């Protein structure tokens, strides 16, 4: 081989490598927080005004604000964390060049992330505290949004010891919690497994493993017993409704009390079915789109509009941030309401309204577009694998008849590709 041939062969070998580099998909790399921020002694001293077992991710927040070159940061807290709002705002303003605005409107959950108001007040960056990233950051418009779950550390040893004293190792357990305690579930599961227990941490995507929302809960394997970590019944009732035959216990990390909990499923279903049946005969409907943060979902609303039109129903659309009986009573000509805001509003308080107030699933049943699930009321509002078009993330079933959980490969599924081919 002469020199020219050798040079050509080397060029041929090198060329593919260059081509790969050119066409490799670009990736967004999030670097760690710089040490000068993470280890800043003055910053650490300032953080001491906050509870030591609450992780507000202050260094990460400061770094993200600096990265975004933000000048105006909107801070959104749930009611239980508002008492820390001014301290956090002071820290952010001290260690960045941004001013802050605390958004004090009521925030019930992750669905209430209010990027609309943040933009309206001129903010160019937003931090939402206390909830998971239910509304993807690519859907919060033109404003960057950082979700801070606020992990809360608690005495996990006490819970494990309590479980060991109450349940024999022959009882399979399912551990779930609100987002603040989710980070502790996997470690506790491993500790219990090492003691001979069968433990699972169920997941309902896109939620984190073990996470429970008031409107979305994972299915629990048959024969298990649920241990739910939290300090109230709202999230607890969600997983109880979703798993009506499963014994459920609530552990309050603050009071360190483990209690057996009950929910009157037959009564709830009886009341809701009677209201659904009453609404099915209504001629004029009111369709409420919730405007509290991102509660209202236009995709779900459009599906309901189509169903109402197909049924020949007269209807009016109303925008409301919060829904009260007196507000709806003022529109006395409306015979039935359906609210696209919080599904639990109808379940928990619907009987307090003088006229039927349905959630999207119940309205779909009333309009004959879905079956009534008498055994298991759906708690799947934000689930990727939801049961019907009454949910924001619902996707029509693949021609293969399976879901991603049972083997479907989504866009890569041969059946999906075949079904999408044009003649």
Curated annotation (Swiss-Prot):
The cofactor note reads: Binds 1 [4Fe-4S] cluster per subunit. The cluster is coordinated with 3 cysteines and an exchangeable S-adenosyl-L-methionine.
- What InterPro entries does its record include? DPH1/DPH2, DPH1/DPH2_1, DPH1/DPH2_2, DPH1/DPH2_3, DPH1/DPH2_euk_archaea
What Enzyme Commission number(s) appear in the record? 2.5.1.108
Family matches, as Pfam families: Diphthamide_syn
Q: What class of enzyme is it?
A: transferase
Q: Which cofactor does it need?
A: [4Fe-4S] cluster
Q: In which pathway does it act?
A: Protein modification; peptidyl-diphthamide biosynthesis
What are the record's GO terms for cellular component?
Answer: 2-(3-amino-3-carboxypropyl)histidine synthase complex
Give any GO molecular function from the UniProt entry: metal ion binding
Q: How does it assemble?
A: Component of the 2-(3-amino-3-carboxypropyl)histidine synthase complex composed of DPH1, DPH2, DPH3 and a NADH-dependent reductase. Interacts with white spot syndrome virus E3 ubiquitin-protein ligase WSSV222.
Q: What is this protein called?
A: 2-(3-amino-3-carboxypropyl)histidine synthase subunit 1
- The species is Penaeus vannamei (Whiteleg shrimp)
């Amino acid at each position: 081989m002469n020199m020219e041939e050798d040079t050509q062969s080397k060029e041929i070998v090198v060329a593919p490598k260059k081509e790969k580099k050119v066409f490799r998909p670009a990736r967004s790399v999030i670097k760690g927080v710089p040490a000068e921020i993470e280890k800043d002694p003055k910053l650490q001293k300032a953080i001491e005004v906050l509870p030591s077992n609450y992780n507000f991710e202050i260094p990460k927040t400061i770094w993200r604000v600096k990265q975004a070159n933000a000048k105006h940061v909107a801070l959104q807290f749930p009611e239980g964390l508002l008492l820390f709002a001014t301290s956090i705002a002071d820290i952010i303003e001290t260690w960045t060049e941004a001013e802050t605005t605390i958004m004090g409107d009521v925030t019930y959950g992750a669905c209430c992330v209010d990027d609309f108001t943040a933009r309206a007040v001129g903010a160019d960056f937003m931090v939402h505290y206390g909830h998971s990233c239910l509304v993807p950051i690519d859907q919060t418009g033109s404003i960057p949004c950082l979700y801070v779950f606020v992990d809360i550390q608690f005495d996990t040893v006490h819970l494990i010891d309590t479980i060991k004293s109450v349940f024999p190792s022959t009882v399979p357990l399912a551990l779930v919690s609100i987002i603040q305690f989710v980070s502790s579930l996997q470690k506790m599961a491993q500790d219990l497994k090492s003691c001979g227990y069968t433990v699972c941490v169920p997941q309902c995507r896109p939620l984190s493993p073990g996470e429970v929302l008031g409107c979305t809960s994972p299915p629990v394997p048959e024969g298990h017993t649920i241990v739910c970590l939290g300090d109230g019944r709202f999230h607890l009732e969600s997983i109880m409704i979703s798993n009506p035959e499963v014994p459920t216990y609530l552990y309050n990390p603050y009071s360190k009390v483990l209690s057996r909990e009950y929910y009157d499923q037959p009564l709830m279903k009886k009341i809701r079915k009677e209201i659904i049946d009453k609404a099915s005969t209504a001629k004029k409907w009111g369709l409420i789109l919730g405007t509290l943060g991102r509660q209202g979902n236009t995709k779900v609303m459009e599906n309901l509009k189509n169903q109402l039109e197909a049924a020949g129903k007269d209807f009016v659309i109303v925008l409301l941030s919060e829904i009260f009986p007196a507000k709806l009573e003022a529109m006395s000509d409306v015979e039935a309401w359906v609210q696209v805001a919080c599904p639990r509003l109808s379940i928990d308080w619907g009987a307090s309204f003088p006229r039927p107030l349905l959630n999207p699933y119940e309205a779909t049943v009333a309009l004959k577009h879905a079956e009534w699930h008498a055994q298991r009321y759906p708690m799947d509002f934000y689930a990727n694998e939801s049961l019907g078009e009454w949910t924001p993330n619902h996707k029509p079933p693949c021609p293969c008849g399976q879901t991603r959980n049972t083997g479907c490969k989504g866009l890569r599924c041969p059946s999906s590709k075949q079904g999408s081919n044009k003649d």
